[in-house]
Protein backbone atom coordinates (compact mmCIF):
# COMPACT_ATOMS: atom_id res chain seq x y z
CA UNK A 1 0.00 0.00 0.00
CA UNK A 2 2.88 2.29 0.86
CA UNK A 3 4.35 1.73 -2.58
CA UNK A 4 0.98 2.46 -4.19
CA UNK A 5 0.60 5.72 -2.24
CA UNK A 6 4.14 6.70 -3.24
CA UNK A 7 3.38 6.01 -6.89
CA UNK A 8 0.24 8.11 -6.71
CA UNK A 9 2.09 10.92 -4.97
CA UNK A 10 4.86 10.91 -7.56
CA UNK A 11 2.28 10.93 -10.34
CA UNK A 12 0.59 13.91 -8.76
CA UNK A 13 3.92 15.76 -8.46
CA UNK A 14 4.70 14.97 -12.13
CA UNK A 15 1.35 16.37 -13.26
CA UNK A 16 1.89 19.43 -11.07
CA UNK A 17 5.31 20.06 -12.58
CA UNK A 18 3.89 19.56 -16.10
CA UNK A 19 1.11 22.00 -15.32
CA UNK A 20 3.56 24.57 -14.00
CA UNK A 21 5.71 24.15 -17.10
CA UNK A 22 2.75 24.87 -19.36
CA UNK A 23 1.85 27.92 -17.30
CA UNK A 24 5.43 29.14 -17.69
CA UNK A 25 5.31 28.57 -21.46
CA UNK A 26 2.03 30.44 -21.76
CA UNK A 27 3.36 33.34 -19.68
CA UNK A 28 6.48 33.57 -21.86
CA UNK A 29 4.38 33.45 -25.04
CA UNK A 30 2.11 36.14 -23.65
CA UNK A 31 5.10 38.37 -22.91
CA UNK A 32 6.48 37.81 -26.42
CA UNK A 33 3.13 38.68 -28.00
CA UNK A 34 2.91 41.82 -25.86
CA UNK A 35 6.41 42.85 -26.89
CA UNK A 36 5.56 42.34 -30.57
CA UNK A 37 2.41 44.44 -30.19
CA UNK A 38 4.34 47.19 -28.40
CA UNK A 39 7.17 47.30 -30.92
CA UNK A 40 5.07 47.07 -34.09
CA UNK A 41 4.07 50.79 -34.08
CA UNK A 42 7.68 51.78 -33.40
CA UNK A 43 8.84 49.60 -36.29
CA UNK A 44 6.23 51.06 -38.62
CA UNK A 45 7.16 54.58 -37.56
CA UNK A 46 10.86 53.87 -38.14
CA UNK A 47 10.14 52.50 -41.61
CA UNK A 48 7.97 55.48 -42.51
CA UNK A 49 10.64 57.86 -41.21
CA UNK A 50 13.16 56.16 -43.49
CA UNK A 51 10.77 56.41 -46.45
CA UNK A 52 10.15 60.10 -45.76
CA UNK A 53 13.89 60.68 -45.61
CA UNK A 54 14.37 58.96 -48.98
CA UNK A 55 11.51 60.96 -50.47
CA UNK A 56 13.18 64.15 -49.26
CA UNK A 57 16.49 63.05 -50.77
CA UNK A 58 14.78 62.36 -54.11
CA UNK A 59 13.52 65.93 -54.21
CA UNK A 60 16.92 67.29 -53.24
CA UNK A 61 18.44 65.39 -56.16
CA UNK A 62 15.78 66.83 -58.45
CA UNK A 63 16.54 70.32 -57.15
CA UNK A 64 20.24 69.86 -57.80
CA UNK A 65 19.45 68.70 -61.34
CA UNK A 66 17.32 71.80 -61.97
CA UNK A 67 20.18 74.06 -60.90
CA UNK A 68 22.74 72.11 -62.93
CA UNK A 69 20.42 72.51 -65.92
CA UNK A 70 20.37 76.25 -65.23
CA UNK A 71 24.19 76.32 -65.01
CA UNK A 72 24.43 74.79 -68.48
CA UNK A 73 21.56 76.55 -70.29
CA UNK A 74 21.43 79.75 -68.16
CA UNK A 75 17.74 79.17 -67.53
CA UNK A 76 15.46 76.64 -65.87
CA UNK A 77 13.64 74.12 -68.06
CA UNK A 78 10.07 74.85 -69.12
CA UNK A 79 7.33 72.83 -67.46
CA UNK A 80 7.03 71.10 -70.82
CA UNK A 81 8.07 71.58 -74.43
CA UNK A 82 5.58 72.04 -77.27
CA UNK A 83 5.46 71.41 -81.00
CA UNK A 84 4.82 74.04 -83.64
CA UNK A 85 1.08 73.83 -82.93
CA UNK A 86 1.51 74.33 -79.19
CA UNK A 87 0.81 70.68 -78.33
CA UNK A 88 2.73 69.52 -75.23
CA UNK A 89 5.60 67.16 -76.03
CA UNK A 90 7.95 66.48 -73.12
CA UNK A 91 8.10 67.14 -69.40
CA UNK A 92 10.77 68.96 -67.42
CA UNK A 93 11.48 65.56 -65.84
CA UNK A 94 12.69 64.37 -69.25
CA UNK A 95 14.75 67.50 -69.84
CA UNK A 96 16.76 67.09 -66.63
CA UNK A 97 17.60 63.40 -67.25
CA UNK A 98 21.27 64.15 -68.09
CA UNK A 99 21.59 65.80 -64.67
CA UNK A 100 20.32 62.78 -62.72
CA UNK A 101 22.82 60.39 -64.32
CA UNK A 102 20.44 59.35 -67.11
CA UNK A 103 22.27 60.69 -70.16
CA UNK A 104 21.94 57.42 -72.10
CA UNK A 105 18.19 57.27 -71.48
CA UNK A 106 17.88 60.90 -72.55
CA UNK A 107 19.67 60.19 -75.81
CA UNK A 108 17.20 57.41 -76.64
CA UNK A 109 14.22 59.79 -76.47
CA UNK A 110 12.97 61.48 -79.63
CA UNK A 111 12.19 64.99 -78.37
CA UNK A 112 10.55 65.92 -81.68
CA UNK A 113 7.77 63.42 -81.05
CA UNK A 114 5.31 63.29 -78.12
CA UNK A 115 6.30 61.57 -74.90
CA UNK A 116 3.80 58.75 -75.48
CA UNK A 117 4.64 58.24 -79.16
CA UNK A 118 5.62 54.65 -80.10
CA UNK A 119 9.08 55.99 -80.94
CA UNK A 120 9.57 56.61 -77.22
CA UNK A 121 8.12 53.32 -76.01
CA UNK A 122 11.43 52.04 -74.64
CA UNK A 123 11.94 55.09 -72.45
CA UNK A 124 8.28 54.96 -71.41
CA UNK A 125 8.85 51.52 -69.86
CA UNK A 126 11.80 52.73 -67.80
CA UNK A 127 11.23 53.12 -64.06
CA UNK A 128 13.30 55.82 -62.35
CA UNK A 129 13.47 55.49 -58.53
CA UNK A 130 14.40 59.16 -58.14
CA UNK A 131 10.89 60.03 -59.37
CA UNK A 132 9.15 57.67 -56.95
CA UNK A 133 8.27 58.29 -53.31
CA UNK A 134 9.07 55.10 -51.34
CA UNK A 135 5.82 55.49 -49.38
CA UNK A 136 3.82 55.00 -52.58
CA UNK A 137 3.44 51.91 -54.74
CA UNK A 138 2.22 53.39 -58.01
CA UNK A 139 1.99 51.78 -61.40
CA UNK A 140 5.41 51.40 -63.08
CA UNK A 141 6.73 54.72 -64.35
CA UNK A 142 4.28 56.86 -62.40
CA UNK A 143 5.38 59.74 -60.20
CA UNK A 144 3.84 61.95 -57.54
CA UNK A 145 6.49 64.67 -58.01
CA UNK A 146 4.82 67.39 -60.05
CA UNK A 147 6.02 70.84 -60.99
CA UNK A 148 3.91 73.81 -59.96
CA UNK A 149 2.87 75.46 -63.21
CA UNK A 150 1.00 78.64 -64.09
CA UNK A 151 1.44 82.12 -65.49
CA UNK A 152 3.58 83.30 -62.57
CA UNK A 153 5.39 80.15 -61.46
CA UNK A 154 9.01 79.16 -61.94
CA UNK A 155 8.36 76.24 -64.27
CA UNK A 156 6.08 77.63 -66.95
CA UNK A 157 4.51 75.92 -69.94
CA UNK A 158 6.71 76.26 -73.03
CA UNK A 159 8.81 79.00 -71.46
CA UNK A 160 12.15 78.92 -69.68
CA UNK A 161 12.79 81.22 -66.74
CA UNK A 162 16.10 82.65 -65.58
CA UNK A 163 16.94 82.62 -61.90
CA UNK A 164 17.10 86.42 -61.76
CA UNK A 165 13.45 86.51 -62.79
CA UNK A 166 12.45 84.78 -59.56
CA UNK A 167 12.16 88.10 -57.75
CA UNK A 168 10.21 86.69 -54.81
CA UNK A 169 13.31 84.74 -53.86
CA UNK A 170 14.24 81.17 -54.74
CA UNK A 171 13.89 80.22 -51.07
CA UNK A 172 10.27 81.40 -51.07
CA UNK A 173 9.07 79.94 -54.37
CA UNK A 174 7.85 76.41 -55.03
CA UNK A 175 9.36 74.34 -57.82
CA UNK A 176 8.05 70.81 -57.29
CA UNK A 177 5.38 69.43 -54.97
CA UNK A 178 4.54 65.94 -53.83
CA UNK A 179 0.88 65.16 -54.53
CA UNK A 180 -1.18 62.21 -53.39
CA UNK A 181 -1.21 59.04 -55.54
CA UNK A 182 -4.51 59.76 -57.25
CA UNK A 183 -2.84 62.71 -59.02
CA UNK A 184 0.21 60.67 -60.10
CA UNK A 185 1.35 60.97 -63.72
CA UNK A 186 3.90 59.16 -65.83
CA UNK A 187 7.31 60.74 -65.36
CA UNK A 188 7.47 61.50 -69.10
CA UNK A 189 4.05 63.14 -69.10
CA UNK A 190 3.83 66.93 -69.51
CA UNK A 191 1.00 67.03 -66.96
CA UNK A 192 1.78 68.85 -63.71
CA UNK A 193 0.14 70.59 -60.76
CA UNK A 194 -1.44 74.01 -60.57
CA UNK A 195 -2.62 76.19 -57.71
CA UNK A 196 -6.10 74.66 -57.75
CA UNK A 197 -4.67 71.16 -57.26
CA UNK A 198 -2.52 72.35 -54.35
CA UNK A 199 -5.42 74.11 -52.66
CA UNK A 200 -7.44 70.92 -52.97
CA UNK A 201 -4.90 68.73 -51.18
CA UNK A 202 -6.19 69.77 -47.75
CA UNK A 203 -9.47 68.04 -48.57
CA UNK A 204 -7.56 64.86 -49.44
CA UNK A 205 -5.39 64.66 -46.33
CA UNK A 206 -6.49 61.11 -45.54
CA UNK A 207 -5.03 59.87 -48.83
CA UNK A 208 -1.63 61.57 -48.56
CA UNK A 209 1.37 59.25 -48.40
CA UNK A 210 2.85 61.11 -45.40
CA UNK A 211 0.85 61.90 -42.30
CA UNK A 212 0.05 65.57 -41.81
CA UNK A 213 1.38 67.04 -45.04
CA UNK A 214 3.62 66.72 -48.06
CA UNK A 215 7.12 67.55 -49.26
CA UNK A 216 7.87 70.50 -51.51
CA UNK A 217 11.02 71.49 -53.35
CA UNK A 218 11.82 75.19 -53.27
CA UNK A 219 13.80 76.84 -56.04
CA UNK A 220 16.87 77.31 -53.89
CA UNK A 221 17.14 73.50 -53.77
CA UNK A 222 15.87 73.09 -50.21
CA UNK A 223 13.06 70.69 -49.31
CA UNK A 224 10.34 71.55 -46.80
CA UNK A 225 7.46 69.55 -45.35
CA UNK A 226 4.29 71.60 -45.61
CA UNK A 227 1.51 71.15 -43.09
CA UNK A 228 -1.68 70.11 -44.81
CA UNK A 229 -3.51 72.91 -43.00
CA UNK A 230 -1.16 75.63 -44.23
CA UNK A 231 -2.92 78.95 -44.76
CA UNK A 232 -4.12 79.49 -48.31
CA UNK A 233 -2.51 82.94 -48.46
CA UNK A 234 0.92 81.45 -47.69
CA UNK A 235 0.47 78.71 -50.29
CA UNK A 236 -0.51 81.27 -52.93
CA UNK A 237 2.57 83.34 -52.07
CA UNK A 238 4.84 80.29 -52.36
CA UNK A 239 3.47 79.47 -55.81
CA UNK A 240 4.16 82.97 -57.14
CA UNK A 241 7.64 83.62 -58.56
CA UNK A 242 7.40 87.38 -58.92
CA UNK A 243 4.35 88.68 -57.14
CA UNK A 244 6.09 90.53 -54.28
CA UNK A 245 4.09 88.37 -51.88
CA UNK A 246 4.83 88.19 -48.17
CA UNK A 247 5.29 84.51 -47.34
CA UNK A 248 5.94 84.93 -43.64
CA UNK A 249 6.66 82.03 -41.31
CA UNK A 250 5.46 78.58 -42.26
Question: Each PLM stretch: what is its role?
Answer:
Residues 1-22, 86:
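N-terminal leader/signal peptides at the extreme start of proteins
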Amino acid sequence: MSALRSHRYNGFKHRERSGNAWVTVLVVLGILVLLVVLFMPATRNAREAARRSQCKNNLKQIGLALHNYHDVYKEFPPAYTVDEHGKPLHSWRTLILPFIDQQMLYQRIDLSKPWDDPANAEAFKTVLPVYQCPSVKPEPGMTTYLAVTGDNTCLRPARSLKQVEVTDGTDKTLAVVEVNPKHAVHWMSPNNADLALLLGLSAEKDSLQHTGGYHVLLFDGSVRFLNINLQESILRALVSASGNDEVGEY
